């Protein structure tokens, strides 16, 4: 399970060092893809393959399905962390997420999300009031 907030830096070669606590779960390979809200999603390879099978089951005769499949799979990059836990973020993915040196990596249960640090703070600021309402909708009576 991926949890927490981390602040690694993107180096000049477009590499990001994954938080040490996640490296074992990602040692078998990972997939980096465009996420929602202009962040990147990082899935363990097995998790992504399971999701991809579900996406592949959708009827490709449906134009929306084809469009989504193209968007998802064309924007996905397979990576293997190096000995120092670094992964290379493809230029197109860096552009999409607006990644600069300052990044934020958050745990989101079954995936990591990589954010531009300023965008992440803006997202938090803009959604703070929505959190209480969403909590009640997602987990009524739990908190």
UniProtKB/Swiss-Prot annotation:
Tree of life domain: Bacteria
SUPFAM superfamilies (UniProt xref): AbrB/MazE/MraZ-like
Similarity comment: Belongs to the MraZ family.
Keywords from the UniProt entry: Cytoplasm, DNA-binding, Repeat, Transcription, Transcription regulation
Name used for this protein in its record: Transcriptional regulator MraZ
Subcellular localization: Cytoplasm, Nucleoid
Any one biological process term the GO annotation gives: negative regulation of DNA-templated transcription initiation
Gene3D superfamilies on file: Transcriptional regulator MraZ domain
SUBUNIT field: Forms oligomers.
Source species of the chain: Saccharopolyspora erythraea (strain ATCC 11635 / DSM 40517 / JCM 4748 / NBRC 13426 / NCIMB 8594 / NRRL 2338)
Gene: mraZ
Main location: cytoplasm
Phylogenetic classification of the source organism: Bacteria, Bacillati, Actinomycetota, Actinomycetes, Pseudonocardiales
